[in-house]
């Protein structure tokens, strides 16, 4: 999982403000296809929002940590049912 400084996190939160969620996680949770879709969107956009249809805050926190671990990304923000995730574009892109 990537680590961000508070200044980097603040800048990314500002950039993410106008974004719409590109992936939704429903009752099936973090399936392989959902992880793949998040990966595809991170490659395309670097910074994405993910909507989680789950009322348990602790489970949403765990989902954010799992996403970041699996995809070597950085958690930017968790507000309500929205997760903001960032991963820098590959150097060869």
Label the predicted regions.
Residues 1-93:
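Positively charged, polar, low-complexity stretches
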